[in-house]
């Protein structure tokens, strides 16, 4: 879980475009965030298994 200060800092606009980085909307994790869903891989997996992300199905081939 991210510190509240880091989450608040991330919500402010960055001074330069290269300073901006993505954080998970659910838990605040800064690494391995899927931009399309704004979720980290851990939260994405949990919500996908529960069926709470529309259009996401388990791969089978």
From Swiss-Prot:
Pfam families in UniProt: Ribosomal_S14 (PF00253)
A Gene Ontology molecular function term of the record: structural constituent of ribosome
InterPro entries hit by this protein: Ribosomal_uS14, Ribosomal_uS14_bact, Ribosomal_uS14_CS, Ribosomal_uS14_sf
GO CC, one annotated term: small ribosomal subunit
Gene3D superfamilies found in the cross-reference section: 30s Ribosomal Protein S14, Chain N (4.10.830.10)
UniProt keywords, alphabetically: Metal-binding, Ribonucleoprotein, Ribosomal protein, RNA-binding, rRNA-binding, Zinc
A GO biological-process term: translation
Domain of life of the source: Bacteria
Function: Binds 16S rRNA, required for the assembly of 30S particles and may also be responsible for determining the conformation of the 16S rRNA at the A site.
HAMAP family per record: Ribosomal_uS14_2_B (MF_01364_B)
Quaternary structure and interacting proteins, as annotated: Part of the 30S ribosomal subunit. Contacts proteins S3 and S10.
PANTHER family: 30S RIBOSOMAL PROTEIN S14, SMALL RIBOSOMAL SUBUNIT PROTEIN US14B
The family this protein is said to belong to: Belongs to the universal ribosomal protein uS14 family. Zinc-binding uS14 subfamily.
Protein name: Small ribosomal subunit protein uS14
Source organism: Streptococcus uberis (strain ATCC BAA-854 / 0140J)
Lineage summary: Bacteria, Bacillati, Bacillota, Bacilli, Lactobacillales
Gene assigned in the entry: rpsZ
């Amino acid at each position: 879980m991210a510190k509240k200060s880091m989450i608040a800092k991330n919500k402010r606009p960055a001074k330069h475009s290269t300073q901006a980085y993505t954080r998970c909307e659910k838990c605040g994790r800064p690494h391995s965030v899927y931009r399309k869903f704004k979720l980290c891989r851990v939260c994405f997996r949990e919500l996908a298994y529960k069926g709470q992300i529309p259009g996401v199905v388990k791969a089978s081939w």
